[in-house]
C-alpha cells in the first residue's frame, strides 16, 4: 500500500487547517500533492500541500486523477466516509 496515492485520505498536520482530513486529488511531484476537503464537507480548500505536512490514514476513496470537488464529494458519500472526513483530530507534532 503506497502511502501517498490518489484517493488516499490524509490528516493535515501543519497550517490553519491542521487536524482536518483531506483527500489527495493529484500528485504534483516528489514533494507536493494537490488535496481537497472538499470545502463543503469540512472546510479544507483545494490546494497544493507539502507531503511532509500531511499524515496518510488507512482509508481511501476511488477517484480519478484531477477529480473535481463534486466528484470527490460523491465518492466520499458513496464510501460512507462523510462522518470520518468531518471529524477533526489532534495532529501528531513531530519532534525536531
Swiss-Prot record:
InterPro entries found in the cross-reference section: KOW, Rib_uL2_dom2, Ribosomal_eL14, Ribosomal_eL14_arc, Translation_prot_SH3-like_sf
Keyword Ribosomal protein: yes
A cellular component annotation (GO) from this entry: cytosolic large ribosomal subunit
GO molecular function: RNA binding; structural constituent of ribosome
Family annotation (Pfam families): KOW
Similarity annotation: Belongs to the eukaryotic ribosomal protein eL14 family.
Cross-referenced NCBIfam families: PRK04333.1
HAMAP family: Ribosomal_eL14
Protein name, per record: Large ribosomal subunit protein eL14
UniProt organism field: Sulfolobus acidocaldarius (strain ATCC 33909 / DSM 639 / JCM 8929 / NBRC 15157 / NCIMB 11770)
Organism lineage string: Archaea, Thermoproteota, Thermoprotei, Sulfolobales, Sulfolobaceae
Amino acid at each position: 500500500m503506497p502511502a501517498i496515492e490518489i484517493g488516499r485520505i490524509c490528516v493535515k498536520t501543519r497550517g490553519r487547517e491542521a487536524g482536518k482530513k483531506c483527500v489527495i486529488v493529484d500528485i504534483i511531484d516528489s514533494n507536493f500533492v494537490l488535496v481537497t476537503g472538499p470545502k463543503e464537507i469540512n472546510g479544507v480548500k483545494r490546494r497544493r500541500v507539502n507531503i511532509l505536512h500531511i499524515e496518510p490514514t488507512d482509508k481511501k476513496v476511488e477517484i480519478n486523477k484531477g477529480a473535481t470537488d463534486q466528484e470527490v464529494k460523491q465518492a466520499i458519500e458513496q464510501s460512507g466516509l462523510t462522518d470520518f472526513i468531518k471529524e477533526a483530530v489532534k495532529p501528531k507534532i513531530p519532534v525536531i
